[in-house]
Regions:
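Flexible "cap/lid" loop of the alpha/beta hydrolase fold
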Residues: 106-114, 118-148
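Short beta-strand/loop motif that positions the catalytic acidic residue
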Residues: 205, 211-213
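Acidic catalytic loop of the alpha/beta-hydrolase fold
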Residues: 215-220, 245
Length: 267
């Protein structure tokens, strides 16, 4: 099992897939999952990318198959970004394309701010950039505290994969993956996120940035998507036509096709 032993007592699981021509040096694409998730959720992206890129899927600290900190760990976006930089060092990846989904996209933007020289591009899929003062995250915290992780996951599942637009088996598997996350990790990361607002740093991110969202997603609101792209100096918003829910999971083929075109023009 591929585990990187990294600073901060982190044993970080990752998948590393590269089916590019072996006599070439493929650029790396790093896929970062969201809160209470893991790298498995990116399964559909790998065959669409790995013929031309080295594709690394991470399980962030506390999630999936990576080590779980004891309660009261000091969570922060800066910490997640630093963990990722350490993994890149371990894998000898000097520079990469970074793609994050939901909170993974928020982390990706933080990484672009902290480590601009290590990225070719950054992509945020269905990702918020402002949490402070938004009651939704406090409501999520209370739900997880009172009823547990699985209750929260199932009660909010329709936001990720809309029932009438997705395979119910996909949705069930998705919920099972999320429900494995330790309760204290979900609570503590939600509490951390409730203090986050990336607004001050976004105008200072110089990396070419793609903001992806489903055309019919409940997350496709001007204050979440259009404003994010406008705050980024080199930001581009693409609403995936006809897509709903969390577009990175509901329409992976469309997302990858859009991303490939974005990378061509970003060079």
């Amino acid at each position: 099992m591929p585990i990187a032993h990294l600073p901060g007592e982190l044993e970080m699981y990752y998948d590393d897939d590269d089916f590019s021509d072996p006599w070439t040096q493929a650029e790396a694409v790093i896929l970062h999952h969201g809160n209470a998730k893991n790298g498995r959720l990116w399964y559909a992206w790998v065959p669409l990318l790995a013929r031309d890129y080295r594709v690394v899927r991470v399980d962030a600290r506390g999630f999936g198959r990576s080590s779980i900190p004891a309660p009261v760990y000091q969570w922060s976006l800066e910490g997640f970004a630093t963990d990722l930089a350490h993994l890149m060092d371990h894998l000898r990846i000097d520079k990469a394309h970074l793609i994050g989904e939901t909170i993974g996209g928020t982390i990706a933007l933080q990484f672009a701010y902290q480590f601009p020289d290590r990225l070719h591009t950054v992509t945020a899929c269905t990702s918020p950039y402002k949490f402070r003062g938004i009651a939704t995250y406090i409501d999520y915290y209370n739900l997880v505290q009172e009823r547990g992780v699985e209750a929260w996951v199932r009660q909010t599942a329709h936001r990720r994969l809309e029932p009438d637009r997705s395979d119910p088996r996909h949705s069930e598997w998705y919920m099972q993956q999320m429900s494995q996350t330790a309760q204290h990790v979900v609570l503590e990361t939600l509490a951390c996120l409730a203090t986050v607002d990336l607004t001050p740093i976004l105008p200072r991110i110089t990396t070419p940035a793609l903001v992806l969202v489903g055309e019919h997603s409940a997350m496709n609101t001007p204050d979440r998507t259009r404003s994010l792209a406008e705050l980024l100096p080199h930001g581009r918003l693409v609403e995936v036509p006809g897509a709903s829910g969390y577009v990175q999971h509901s329409a992976p083929e469309q997302c990858v096709a859009i991303w490939r075109e974005f990378v061509k023009t970003a060079r």
